[in-house]
C-alpha cells in the first residue's frame, strides 16, 4: 500500500469510532467538548475513572490525531482537535448503525422468523440511541430547524418528544423572553430535562410533562397558543399502527396553535441524491422490518398536513441523509 494521505477512509473512521466510543463510555467526550484545556487528573476526577487509564486514553487520542497536545510537561495537557466536532458527527453515524442498532442487526435471522417476539426480546438501548443521535444531529439535523425557529422569534415553543430537554434549552438561550413546554413518554428523560432546566437557570421558563404525544388529541391545552410546535423524529413512531391518531394530532396542532407553525423533522423512505441513498435505504429498512414503522414520503407528509387544515407547507432537505424538515402554517 502506498504511503499517501487518503483522507477519511473506512479504516480511519473505524479507528476513530473505537476510540471515541471508549471515551463515551468513560464519560470523557463531553468533557473534551466543553473544556478548552484537559489533563488526565482533572478528566479522571470528572469521570470517576482511574487517572492512569485516562492518561493512556488521552495519549492514544493524541496519537490518533483526534486531540492536540498543548504541553508534554507533566501534567500533560490537551485540547480537542480542530476537526473534533466534525469527527464526532461522522462517527455518530457509525455508532448509531453498529452500536445502537446492534440488537437488530445481530439478531436479524430471529427478526425474520418472528418479528414481534424479536422486538420484545432485543430492544435497543435508549441511552445509546439518544447519544448517537445527538452525535449525528448536532451538525446534521439540529441546526436547520433551530435556525428556522430563531428566525420566527416565537414566544412559546412546544417540543413533542422532548427527551432530556436539550432542544428547548438551546432555543430559550437563543430567544430571550420565550417559554417552552416539553412532552415526552419517558419519565426518566423528563426528570433529566427538569434537572437540566434548573442547572441552566430556566425552571421558570420551561415546563416538562411526562405523557405520550397522543394525549394532545384529547387535551390540547399544552399546545394552546403555541407559536412553534416542533416534532423531531417522533411522528413516525405512530405509523402505521396509529395513523388515525397521527391525523388527529396534526388536526389538533392546526386547530389549537392558531397563529403557530408546526415543524416536523423526520426521514423519508427513499432518497434520490446519491449521497443520501445508502443511509436512507438502511434507515427505512431497519424501521420497516425491525421496528414495524412506516416512513412517509415528502408528498405523503404534504398531503397529510393539507388535510389537517394547514394552508402553507414547505419541505426542505437537511444535511442528514434522508432527513427532511416540513414547515406547516395556516
Tell where the protein language model's regions lie, with residue ranges:
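N-terminal accessory segments
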Residues: 1-104
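Conserved SAM-binding loop
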Residues: 193-194
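A short, conserved alpha-helix within the catalytic core of class I
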Residues: 238-252
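Conserved alpha-helix/loop element of class I SAM-dependent methyltransferases that forms part
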Residues: 136-155
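Conserved class I S-adenosyl-L-methionine
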Residues: 153-163
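Conserved SAM-binding loop of SAM-dependent methyltransferases across substrates and taxa
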Residues: 164-176
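Conserved SAM/SAH-binding beta-strand->alpha-helix loop
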Residues: 186-188
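C-terminal alpha-helical "lid/dimerization" subdomain adjacent to the S-adenosyl-L-methionine
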Residues: 265-308, 312-316
Amino acid at each position: 500500500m502506498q504511503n499517501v494521505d487518503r483522507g477519511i477512509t473506512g479504516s480511519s473512521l473505524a479507528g476513530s469510532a473505537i476510540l471515541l466510543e471508549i471515551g463515551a463510555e468513560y464519560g470523557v467526550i463531553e468533557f473534551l467538548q466543553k473544556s478548552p484545556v484537559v489533563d488526565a487528573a482533572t478528566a479522571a476526577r470528572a469521570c470517576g475513572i482511574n487517572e492512569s487509564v485516562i492518561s493512556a486514553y488521552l495519549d492514544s487520542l493524541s496519537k490518533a490525531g483526534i486531540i492536540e497536545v498543548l504541553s508534554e510537561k507533566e501534567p500533560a495537557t490537551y485540547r480537542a482537535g480542530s476537526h473534533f466536532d466534525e469527527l464526532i458527527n461522522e462517527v455518530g453515524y457509525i455508532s448509531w448503525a453498529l452500536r445502537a442498532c446492534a440488537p437488530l442487526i445481530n439478531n436479524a435471522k430471529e427478526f425474520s422468523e418472528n418479528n414481534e417476539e424479536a422486538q420484545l426480546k432485543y430492544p435497543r438501548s435508549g441511552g445509546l440511541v439518544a447519544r448517537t443521535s445527538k452525535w449525528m444531529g448536532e451538525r446534521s439535523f439540529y441546526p436547520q430547524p433551530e435556525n428556522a425557529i430563531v428566525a420566527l422569534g416565537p414566544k412559546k415553543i412546544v417540543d413533542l418528544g422532548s427527551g432530556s430537554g436539550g432542544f428547548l434549552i438551546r432555543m430559550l438561550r437563543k430567544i430571550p423572553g420565550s417559554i417552552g413546554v416539553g412532552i415526552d413518554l419517558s419519565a426518566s428523560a423528563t426528570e433529566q430535562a427538569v434537572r437540566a432546566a434548573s442547572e441552566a437557570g430556566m425552571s421558570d421558563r420551561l415546563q416538562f410533562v411526562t405523557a405520550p404525544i397522543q394525549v394532545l388529541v384529547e387535551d390540547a391545552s399544552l399546545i394552546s397558543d403555541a407559536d412553534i410546535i416542533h416534532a423531531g423524529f417522533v411522528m413516525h413512531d405512530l405509523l402505521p399502527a396509529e395513523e388515525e391518531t397521527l391525523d388527529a394530532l396534526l388536526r389538533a396542532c392546526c386547530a389549537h396553535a392558531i397563529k403557530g407553525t408546526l415543524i416536523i423533522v423526520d426521514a423519508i423512505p427513499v432518497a434520490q441524491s446519491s449521497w443520501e441513498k445508502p443511509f436512507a435505504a438502511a434507515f427505512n429498512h431497519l424501521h420497516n422490518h425491525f421496528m414495524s414503522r412506516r416512513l412517509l414520503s415528502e408528498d405523503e407528509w404534504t398531503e397529510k398536513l393539507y388535510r389537517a387544515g394547514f394552508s402553507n407547507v414547505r419541505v426542505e432537505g437537511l444535511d442528514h441523509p434522508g432527513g427532511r424538515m416540513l414547515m406547516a402554517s395556516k
